[in-house]
Amino acid sequence: MCIRDSGIRVNVTLIFSQSQAILAAKAGAKYVSPFVGRVDDNSFGGLCLVKDIAKVFREHMVSTEVLAASLRGVRDVGRAFEYGADIVTMPTKVFEGMYNHILTDKGLDQFDKDYAESISGV
């Protein structure tokens, strides 16, 4: 019996190679989680691993989704999606870094000033 046949949506975590992801998908996992940061810590190419897994899943029409984990920077998030990740996980500081931007802050300050001037009759 395949895991998927039981109705349980399984995430196989601690994926460090394309072959591990393929085995998990063949066993019926709904998600595989390559640990990008940990791969980078021990070699290089954590995001390339995401790309390689997503590519083989697409080519073979595998329905298992790629959940890129252990992302450590804002750029990692964008690249993970660019390389085919379906889902990402990240620390709060990375999430906050995604929506915080100096130009956004400056723009909001200017909007506030413009609004204040418009209602004060200046």
Roles of regions detected by a PLM:
Residues S17-A27, R72-D86:
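Catalytic cores of alpha/beta
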Residues A21, V50-A54, V77-G78, L108:
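Generic structural signal for well-ordered alpha-helices
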Residues L14, K30-N42, A85-T104:
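Glycine-rich phosphate-binding active-site loops on the catalytic face of alpha/beta enzymes
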Residues F44-H60:
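Short loop-to-alpha-helix "cap/lid" segments that border enzyme active sites
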Residues M1-C2:
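Short, small-residue-biased leader/transition segments that mark boundaries at the very start
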Residues V50, G97-G121:
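C-terminal helical cap(s) of enzyme catalytic domains, especially alpha/beta-barrels
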Residues I8-I22, S33-S43, V66-S70:
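Catalytic beta/alpha-barrel core
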Residues S6-I8, G28-K30, V62-E65, D86:
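Short, well-ordered coil/turn segments that N-cap beta-strands
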